[in-house]
C-alpha cells in the first residue's frame, strides 16, 4: 500500500520525471492509448472519474486525466463500464468497440490521430494478457503511428489482492500459470489444462466460466479434489463477488451462481495459505542489504 508500482515507474520514466497526467490510483484498471504530438501513448488508467474510488500511495496535485483531455475515447464496451468514460471533456466522441469490426475501429482512431487530436483506447487489466492488441499494433506499425504501452494490473493480480493470498509458497509452490480453458479457440496440444495441471502450481484461468465443467474434469486429473479454488467475478467492479470452495465443486460454484466469462478462476494450495516463511528476512539469510 503506497509502494510504487511498475506502472507508476514506467509512467515516471516516460514523463522524464515530470508531473504525471494520471497519478497512481487503486480501482478498476484500464489502459489508455493516446496521441501526443505525433505519438500514440498507452498508460494505465483507473476507476477515477468520481471521488468515490479508493486511492493509495499517490500525489494527487496533478488531477488531469487522459480521458478528460481526449477527443476520442474508444473503449471495450463488453468489458469496460460506461461510467468510466463519464470524465470525458464536453464534446468528446465516446464509442464502444463491442459492435465494431477491427477495420471500423482502425478507421476511427486514425481519423482523430491524423487530425492531431488526443485518442484514448480503453482496455481492461493488462492489455498484453489476452488483450487482443496485437492486431492494433500491426495497424499502428503499418501506418507509422507511434505508440507506447505501459504495463498494468491484470485480473489475476487483482484476484490475489482480493483473496488476500500470496500465489507462491516458499519451498512448496514457486510457479504461477496463466492460461484458459479450451473454448471456440483451440488450445495448443502441449498447453492442454490436463498437462499444465501436472505441476500442481497456482493456476489462474481466464475466460473459462463457460467451459467450467470441462476445466474441472481436466484439473482433477492431477490436482486433489480438495484443492482450494476461487471463482472471482467482476474483480475491482462495484458488483465484485468471490466464491471459495474446493476443486471438486468448482463447476457447481460457477453454474449455481450464474458466473460469466468475466470470471477469474484460481486453483491451488496458495489460496488462504498462511504457512511457510520466506528466507528473505531470516537472521540467517545474508544478502546485499543485510550482511
Which residues fall in each region the model found?
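A contiguous loop/helix-start segment that scaffolds small-molecule binding in enzyme catalytic cores
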Residues: 12-13, 17-18, 24-48, 104, ...
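Extreme N-terminal basic, low-complexity initiation segments
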Residues: 2-11
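Class I SAM-dependent methyltransferase SAM-binding "motif I" and its flanking Rossmann-like core
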Residues: 55, 126-199, 241-244
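Residues at the C-termini of beta-strands that transition into short coil/loop
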Residues: 77, 98, 151-153, 182, ...
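Class I S-adenosyl-L-methionine
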Residues: 6, 19-150
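Alpha-helix capping/helix-boundary segments
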Residues: 79-81, 128, 155, 211, ...
Amino acid at each position: 500500500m503506497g509502494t510504487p508500482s511498475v506502472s507508476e515507474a514506467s509512467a515516471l520514466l516516460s514523463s522524464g520525471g515530470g508531473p504525471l497526467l494520471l497519478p497512481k490510483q487503486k480501482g478498476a484498471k484500464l489502459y489508455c492509448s493516446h496521441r501526443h504530438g505525433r505519438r500514440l501513448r498507452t498508460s494505465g488508467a483507473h476507476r477515477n472519474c468520481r471521488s468515490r474510488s479508493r486511492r493509495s500511495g499517490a500525489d494527487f496535485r496533478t488531477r488531469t486525466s487522459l480521458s478528460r483531455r481526449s477527443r476520442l475515447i474508444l473503449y471495450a464496451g463488453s468489458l469496460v463500464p460506461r461510467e468510466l468514460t463519464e470524465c470525458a471533456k464536453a464534446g468528446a466522441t465516446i464509442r464502444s468497440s463491442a459492435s465494431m469490426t477491427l477495420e471500423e475501429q482502425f478507421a476511427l482512431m486514425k481519423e482523430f490521430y491524423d487530425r492531431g487530436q488526443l485518442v484514448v483506447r480503453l482496455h481492461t487489466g493488462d492489455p498484453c494478457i489476452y488483450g487482443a492488441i496485437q492486431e492494433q499494433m500491426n495497424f499502428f506499425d503499418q501506418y507509422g503511428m507511434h505508440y507506447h504501452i505501459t504495463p498494468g494490473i491484470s485480473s489475476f493480480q487483482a484476484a490475489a489482492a482480493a483473496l488476500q493470498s500470496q500465489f507462491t509458497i516458499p519451498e512448496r509452490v514457486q510457479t504461477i500459470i496463466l492460461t484458459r480453458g479450451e473454448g471456440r479457440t483451440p488450445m495448443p496440444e502441449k498447453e492442454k489444462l490436463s498437462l499444465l495441471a501436472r505441476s500442481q502450481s497456482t493456476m489462474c484461468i481466464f475466460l473459462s466460466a463457460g467451459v467450467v465443467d470441462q476445466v474441472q474434469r481436466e484439473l482433477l486429473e492431477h490436482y486433489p479434489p480438495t484443492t482450494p479454488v476461487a471463482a472471482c467475478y467482476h474483480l475491482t467492479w462495484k458488483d465484485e463477488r468471490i466464491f471459495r470452495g474446493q476443486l471438486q465443486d468448482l463447476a457447481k460454484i460457477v453454474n449455481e451462481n450464474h458466473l460469466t466469462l468475466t470470471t477469474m478462476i484460481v486453483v491451488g494450495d496458495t489460496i488462504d495459505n498462511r504457512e511457510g516463511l520466506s528466507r528473505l528476512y531470516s537472521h540467517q539469510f545474508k544478502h546485499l542489504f543485510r550482511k
